[in-house]
């Protein structure tokens, strides 16, 4: 579903069409989608009074960088459109609002460049199963339990404190086909379009999935038949020879021996085997354990991962009516907050590690509460 504004220069209202979903890429969707419904919103005299005497700030934002995560990388991909820049936080602060929870952020370490970007520095998050080796920028394995799919925020902190701008997944084609997924509705046309036939490709062997097509186009994927060839391409992509081929080959061989013998103590290999005890993961999420260097499972694949910005979990301190509070605890006259900027009821009700669908309910609830409170204040 999409919105196509037809409001023109009228700043007192909005007329729009609700567009039917299509499976075309976002850049051409509006040109081909069919209108399913239309609506108009017009500002009444009472609404214009609200603009003059009371303002509600419903916004999402990304701002700040927590000291506990180490220095912010010079190069980051953007997981949100350009307009989601956090500037409204500073605007509210300049009006007297108190910001809290500025160290509460959620970013992802598994970002890759979108080969068909919709906004600047558009990044896509890889949702990986547990089998790939996760390496730092020097080609060394991350410590336990920083495995794919385990503790994304822990990886962000580890890489930041170590001064690494990027990291790597090391896997092979068989693991890529079985375990990789992409975050976002645009990257999952089978789910977005409710296409059961396309969805079945995720479970059927020998099928080319949308993820594999994406991987062929994305410049952050490199492939080779041997570790030495792969390292040469990894260093070329990174722009500097930071990874030693002999050291990485020893790492891969040690991992493969543990898988082959079935007697090793490698925590990641053990965790992968445990994940396959759940039938759904065994069918569509976790590849059967095998050697990374198995020629039948090749070629080898390395993915250069960059930091992907996503969420500021703190925000403006509010009371239970959604009124924004100043440093002295008193409401800022006429200023209300709703949505992510309110932290869903006080600037950070979800703590440090809330994400994904847990945001929607808080946005709806805080919007309802602050809207009612503002209406009551105007009616008084």
Task: Give a label for each model feature.
Residues 3-30:
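A conserved short coil-to-beta-strand element within the FAD-binding core of flavoproteins
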Residues 7, 47, 51-56, 137, ...:
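Short, well-ordered coil/turn residues at beta-beta hairpins
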Residues 21-24, 130-145, 314-327:
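Active-site and channel-lining beta-strand-loop segments
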Residues 37-39, 44-116, 156, 356, ...:
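Glycine-rich loop(s) and the adjacent beta-strand/alpha-helix scaffold that form part
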Residues 89-91, 98-243, 247:
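An anion/pyrophosphate-binding glycine-rich loop and adjacent beta-alpha core
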Residues 127-129, 310-312, 356:
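Short, small/polar residue-rich loop motifs at catalytic or cofactor-binding pockets
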Residues 243-345, 349:
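A glycine-rich dinucleotide-binding beta-alpha-beta segment and adjacent secondary-structure elements
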Residues 326, 330-378:
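Catalytic phosphate/nucleotide-handling subdomain of diverse soluble enzymes
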């Amino acid at each position: 579903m999409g919105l196509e504004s037809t409001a023109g220069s009228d700043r007192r209202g909005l007329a729009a069409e609700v567009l039917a979903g299509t499976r075309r890429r976002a850049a051409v969707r509006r040109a081909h989608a069919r209108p399913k419904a239309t609506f108009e919103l017009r500002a009444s005299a009472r609404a214009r009074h609200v603009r003059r005497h009371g303002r509600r700030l419903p916004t999402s934002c990304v701002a700040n960088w927590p000291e506990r995560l180490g220095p912010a990388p010079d190069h980051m991909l953007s997981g949100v459109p350009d307009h989601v820049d956090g500037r409204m936080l500073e605007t509210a602060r300049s009006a007297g609002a108190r910001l809290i929870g500025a160290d509460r952020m959620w970013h992802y370490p598994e970002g890759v460049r979108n080969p068909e970007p919709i906004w600047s520095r558009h990044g896509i998050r890889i949702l990986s199963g547990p089998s790939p080796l996760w390496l730092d920028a020097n080609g060394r394995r991350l410590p336990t339990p920083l495995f794919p799919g385990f503790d994304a925020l822990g990886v962000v902190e580890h890489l930041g404190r170590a001064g690494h701008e990027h990291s790597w997944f090391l896997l092979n084609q068989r693991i890529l086909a079985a375990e990789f997924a992409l975050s976002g509705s645009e990257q999952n046309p089978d789910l977005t379009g409710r296409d059961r036939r396309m969805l079945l490709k995720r479970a059927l062997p020998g099928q080319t999935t949308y993820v594999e097509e994406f991987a062929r186009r994305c410049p952050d994927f490199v492939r080779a038949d041997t570790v030495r060839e792969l390292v040469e391409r990894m260093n070329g992509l990174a722009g500097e020879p930071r990874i030693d081929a002999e050291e990485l080959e020893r790492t891969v061989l040690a991992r493969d021996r543990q898988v082959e013998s079935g007697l090793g103590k490698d925590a990641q290999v053990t965790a992968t085997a445990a994940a396959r005890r759940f039938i759904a993961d065994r069918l569509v999420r976790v590849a059967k354990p095998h050697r990374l260097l198995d020629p039948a499972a090749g070629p080898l694949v390395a993915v250069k991962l960059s930091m992907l910005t996503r969420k500021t979990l703190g925000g403006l301190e509010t009371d239970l009516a959604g009124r924004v509070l100043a440093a002295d605890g008193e409401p800022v006259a006429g200023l209300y907050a709703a949505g992510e900027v309110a932290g869903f009821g006080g600037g950070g009700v979800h703590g440090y590690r809330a994400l994904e669908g847990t945001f929607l309910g808080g946005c709806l609830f805080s919007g309802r509460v602050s809207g009612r409170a503002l209406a009551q204040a105007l009616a008084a």
